[in-house]
């Protein structure tokens, strides 16, 4: 059968699979688009943009940042959570467009992106430490994220949180040379046992091993996580 005779939905599925699994998804999709009319139409489908593995195109960020951001915007418009996540951090950290950045991060979170939820929490807590009375609102938001389904929020288990933190830190390091500074170090807890190590964890090869610690409250738990994040970026 001639390829032009295949149903359009099958062509879209094939193209989306390439966008998802390819090591070089952008160049492969561009080549496919240029090959014939039927694939040009298939590559324009929203599903292809939604499935594009944009995290495999970081080299484009250094070679042609304008094109990289253009690809992210098109994919984010199609509902690609990773594209929304990276674009949100770019807007927030590099372009100082806080409202736009948070909007993209929220869009990613709504599509189940755990690192986006984590970053919204860290941003909220970071900002709250600059203003009296803001910490409680930030902590309520963080608890909302952590109590969400596993696909939509960061896990409160040590390993789950460390994994999400690594992902967030990795993107932050790739996107910007700017580093966050604590507006004000969190007030130490009066409980002498709060934050004490319960069980020692062997240091991971990447230096990101987390010990099991006991905290007296959700406030102290999140403040410790915030300090961990700042130290890593």
Language-model segments: residues:
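TPR/TPR-like (Sel1-like) alpha-helical repeat modules
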Residues: 109-110, 114, 130-151
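CRL adaptor-proximal regions
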Residues: 1-5, 218-221, 230-233
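Short coil/turn linking the two alpha-helices of tandem helical-hairpin repeats
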Residues: 88-97, 126-131
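TPR/TPR-like alpha-solenoid helical repeat scaffolds
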Residues: 120-129, 153-182, 186
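Short helix-capping/linker turns of helical repeat alpha-solenoids
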Residues: 78-81, 111-114, 127
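Skp1-binding F-box subdomain of Cullin-RING ligase substrate receptors
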Residues: 1-86, 90, 98-102
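Alpha-solenoid helical repeat scaffolds
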Residues: 85-87, 118-121, 135-136
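A conserved position within tetratricopeptide repeats
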Residues: 40, 76, 92, 109, ...
